[in-house]
UniProtKB/Swiss-Prot annotation:
This is Cytochrome c-type biogenesis protein CcmE. The chain crosses the membrane at residues 9-29. It comes from Escherichia coli (strain K12). GO terms for cellular component: ATP-binding cassette (ABC) transporter complex. The gene is ccmE. Residues 30-159 are periplasmic. Heme chaperone required for the biogenesis of c-type cytochromes. Transiently binds heme delivered by CcmC and transfers the heme to apo-cytochromes in a process facilitated by CcmF and CcmH. The keyword Endoplasmic reticulum does not apply. Residues 132-159 are annotated as: Disordered. It is found in: Cell inner membrane. Residues 1-8 are cytoplasmic. Forms a ternary complex with CcmC and CcmD. Interacts with CcmF. Shuttles between CcmC and CcmF for heme delivery. One of its GO terms (molecular function) is heme binding.
């Protein structure tokens, strides 16, 4: 092999190694910023497709409805705890900060935070439903999937 070919080979190897390193670093950086979307039922029972449940300490977004009667505010701080639910289950949420003006019981919310033991979410951000016609696409899709059940499931057994 002549010297010119060796130099080209070394340059090609260096470029490929640099490209592989760059791709690896970008994927590592993106992995730490990805928040997966779950419903309360998916946190309890796993995603429908894979039955994989989120791990404790995982960052995630959870969408559902604020359970009526569940909002508890600490009178000495901005700490708030509440429960969000869907058709399959409910999870407790703790948040410290100012809640959106549209936040209230029975309203749709998306919380962003970290999963703790006991299916408890330590929220870093709370997003409330904008108006009576707006639903975040992830929440709309999840709620539609949760409510696609036969009418007999929802009938009152006393009737």
């Amino acid at each position: 092999m002549n010297i010119r070919r060796k130099n080209r080979l070394w340059i090609a190897c260096a470029v490929l190694a640099g490209l592989a390193l760059t791709i690896g670093l970008v994927l590592y950086a993106l992995r730490s910023n990805i928040d997966l979307f779950y419903t309360p039922g998916e946190i309890l029972y796993g995603k429908r497709e894979t039955q994989q449940m989120p791990e404790v300490g995982q960052r995630l977004r959870v969408g559902g409805m604020v359970m009526p009667g569940s909002v508890q505010r600490d009178p000495n701080s901005l700490k708030v705890t509440f429960t969000i639910y869907d058709a399959e289950g409910s999870v407790d949420v703790s948040y410290e900060g100012i809640l959106p003006d549209l936040f209230r019981e029975g309203q749709g919310v998306v919380v962003q935070g970290e999963l703790e033991k006991g299916n408890h979410i330590l929220a870093k951000e709370v997003l409330a439903k904008h108006d009576e016609n707006y639903t975040p696409p992830e929440v709309e899709k999840a709620m539609e999937a949760n409510h696609r059940r036969p009418a007999s499931v929802y009938k009152d057994p006393a009737s």
